[in-house]
């Protein structure tokens, strides 16, 4: 086993526009600190269209040169449209600036981009001070998504008292609030909303629903159907409409009338290519999928090793649930598991890695966990001790380095900064470099461990109550 980690915090720096259009890898990525609102004339003068994109992999992901984000094909087509009558030296290049969905319009208003492409519905009440495009997708309903084998629903009223997991800034939030007002009039229990951790995007929540970690979520119909093709245990309850269908749109600066008119002309004639999801389906169908780490048998396994995880977690100042999450990903909490390259045991540590931290016997659970905890702490101390990293991102970088090697992760952080991404943030930022250079393997590894940690952390009180008995 050779495992390592990556992580990053939030800081977008200026990336110089230059560089020719890379048709194979899709629109380039960039960031800008410009505060001046720009219209089409300024865009043509600079030869760069700065597009603020939703940082989720569903919206703007690219894996080893293959676009899997739904906005990639549209933005590439927009670039061709803008350059249709231009001479070679006057061509405009689209540059992507990935941001959290809830930050897109604010960044647009500050002049940090020329166009915002969220790829999802925005709350209409939050849309002000910007120009709004014609529909990118019209009449988009929000649908309930659950797991096959669990109860299905046909009416909104049946959701009374149920919990729905939503990502930050989900378009379903206001709709559920309106439904709850109607339920209150009927003296029915409200729908409860669990706002998930910001390290999770819509695709992550859907994966956790498929695993049974979350039971229900609500997403846009195109997103639900897209991911159901690669997550076959998802169940889409198409009869349950959450709110009224709305339009997915793009947004420009308030005064960018020429750019808005050009975007609207482009959208009026745009047709998505029939094979636009070919790479997405090929890549994601073979990815590791998380399981429910808190099913009955898994809880029993966790209880059996909980004491040793807590002991060595405390010794190395690592949350024991981080160790538990890593152990579940590596061995499904099976101390007898055998891997490749000599990796073995609960943590799938290799003898060479154990020897580096002074542990010679990893055949038993105690030594196996001790070696892994020490190794994680060594990586953290030598490479990721900066106070600029928050603890969640620090742990993500440690895991990435555990999987890839610390030096490689540090090089990825440097490349992220060079491109205007946030080198102190792993999730959705530095992970983009890993996806480009290595593929989904290390990104999937870190994300899976993170999901298991979040699943355990939701049940921390009950898991630690068991520990005190």
Language model: regions and residue ranges:
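Extracytoplasmic small-molecule ligand-binding "clamshell" domains
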Residues: 24-122, 128, 195-200, 263
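Periplasmic-binding protein-like
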Residues: 53-57, 134-150, 222-266, 286-291, ...
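Acidic, polar ligand-binding/catalytic clefts
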Residues: 76, 87-158, 224-226, 231-244, ...
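Export/targeting segments at the very N-terminus of extracytoplasmic proteins
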Residues: 285-332, 366-369, 383-387, 468
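Substrate-binding/active-site groove segments that recognize
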Residues: 336-360, 366-378, 424-425, 449
